[in-house]
């Protein structure tokens, strides 16, 4: 399967660079189990879900992971904290005119907090902070909004690039689980009143989510690694949902990857799991847990577009995307949403 199989034309003006005034005011394109698409508003999910269905949400929180700083010589640098190893050490991306060497001292924030580059780990730098990382990020960091916004983070992003249900103890992502950004408290309450249940997994989203596929044959692509947790409580609810004949609805590709990673770790069995995942889902993959997926519209030739193409199929997804472009849906992180049903065989 070739990378070019997942290409489509997207006018730049359809990229949503700011959120709508109301989270749940987005549009929704439903791709059903027969491969037919239907236009809705996002709040119509109340009618598209059944009592007893289960929503699986990713409760991670986005860090203010981007730090501006300088070298000892005064040259500008930028650090993006990818993964914290402990309170003071992290794997980081560093933008600089020249790559810093092991032992280099850098300074971040307005108060010039010292950090030291300790070495490399694959394509990342191992960076030791002189103070605990999270307070430094909270005081001096910026939210790492996606590069396709083509702007700096603003005050509106502080609220709107986080989910309303994030767990403040789970602050470790460098990108939001964006399908969840459509849910506000009112919509969640209405789903609860209908009897739609909800549960949580955790997947800390890494910057690799924005990395392009660079191999013509997509099967040669190596996925980035992300930490996830699928707890026993969630597994119990999934098993009960399937026993009732109801649907498991993953909210976002991150929740999907967490659930399917847990299943793959147990040979396809539905069971709890915690660990690092590099799962790459593309057409031909057999889903073990996910029946339906809520997701945003994704970049051409991205691994996320490949994932959604595995749940329906590539032709159906690209036809739905073509319709979305013609009908002026809003794309990417702050854009509109899709509800995709697993294709009936």
From Swiss-Prot:
Query: Which HAMAP family does the entry link to?
Result: QueA
Function, in words: Transfers and isomerizes the ribose moiety from AdoMet to the 7-aminomethyl group of 7-deazaguanine (preQ1-tRNA) to give epoxyqueuosine (oQ-tRNA).
**Main localization of the protein?**
cytoplasm
Reactions catalysed: 7-aminomethyl-7-carbaguanosine(34) in tRNA + S-adenosyl-L-methionine = epoxyqueuosine(34) in tRNA + adenine + L-methionine + 2 H(+)
* Presence of keyword Metal-binding: no
Organism ancestry:
Bacteria, Pseudomonadati, Pseudomonadota, Gammaproteobacteria, Moraxellales
Per the similarity annotation, which family is this? Belongs to the QueA family.
Q: What class of enzyme is it?
A: transferase
Check the record and name the Gene3D superfamilies matching this protein. Answer: QueA-like (3.40.1780.10)
Alphabetic keyword roster: Cytoplasm, Queuosine biosynthesis, S-adenosyl-L-methionine, Transferase
Q: What GO molecular-function term can you cite, just one?
A: S-adenosylmethionine:tRNA ribosyltransferase-isomerase activity
Q: Which InterPro entries match?
A: QueA (IPR003699), QueA_dom1 (IPR042118), QueA_dom2 (IPR042119), QueA_sf (IPR036100)
Please give the name of this protein.
Answer: S-adenosylmethionine:tRNA ribosyltransferase-isomerase
Please give the organism: Acinetobacter baumannii (strain ACICU)
Pfam families, A to Z: Queuosine_synth
Pathway named in the protein's UniProt entry: tRNA modification; tRNA-queuosine biosynthesis
The disulfide bridges present are none
Q: Which domain of life is it from?
A: Bacteria
Location in the cell: Cytoplasm
Q: Which GO terms describe its biological process?
A: queuosine biosynthetic process; tRNA wobble guanine modification
Provide the assembly information: Monomer.
Q: Which GO terms describe its cellular component?
A: cytoplasm
* EC numbers for this chain: 2.4.99.17
């Amino acid at each position: 399967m070739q990378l070019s199989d997942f290409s489509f034309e997207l006018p730049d003006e359809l990229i949503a660079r700011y959120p709508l005034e109301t989270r749940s005011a987005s549009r929704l394109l439903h791709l059903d189990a027969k491969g037919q698409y239907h236009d809705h508003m996002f709040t119509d999910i109340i009618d598209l879900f059944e009592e007893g269905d289960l929503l699986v949400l990713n409760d991670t929180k986005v860090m203010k992971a981007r730090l501006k700083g300088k070298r000892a010589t005064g040259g500008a640098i930028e650090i993006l904290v990818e993964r914290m190893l402990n309170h003071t050490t992290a794997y980081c991306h560093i933008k600089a005119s020249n790559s810093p060497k092991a032992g280099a001292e850098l300074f971040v924030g307005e108060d010039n907090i010292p950090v030291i580059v300790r070495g490399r780990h694959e394509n990342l730098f191992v960076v030791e902070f002189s103070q605990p990382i999270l307070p430094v990020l909270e005081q001096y960091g910026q939210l790492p909004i996606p590069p396709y916004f083509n702007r700096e983070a603003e005050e509106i992003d502080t609220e709107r690039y986080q989910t309303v249900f994030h767990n403040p103890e789970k602050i470790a992502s460098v990108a939001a689980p964006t399908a969840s950004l459509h849910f506000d408290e009112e919509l969640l309450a209405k789903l609860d009143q209908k009897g739609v249940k909800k549960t949580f997994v955790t997947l800390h989203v890494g910057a690799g989510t924005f990395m392009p596929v660079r191999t013509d044959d997509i099967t040669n692509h190596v996925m980035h690694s992300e930490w996830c947790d699928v707890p026993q409580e969630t597994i119990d609810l999934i098993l009960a949902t399937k026993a009732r004949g109801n649907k498991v609805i993953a909210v976002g590709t991150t929740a999907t990857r967490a659930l399917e990673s847990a299943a793959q770790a147990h040979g396809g069995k539905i069971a709890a799991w915690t660990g690092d995942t590099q799962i790459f889902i593309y057409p031909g993959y057999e889903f073990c847990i996910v029946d339906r997926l809520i997701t945003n519209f994704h970049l051409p030739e991205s691994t996320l577009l490949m994932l959604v193409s595995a749940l329906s199929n590539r032709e159906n997804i690209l036809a739905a995307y073509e319709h979305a472009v013609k009908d002026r849906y809003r794309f990417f992180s702050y854009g509109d949403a899709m509800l995709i049903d697993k294709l009936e065989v």
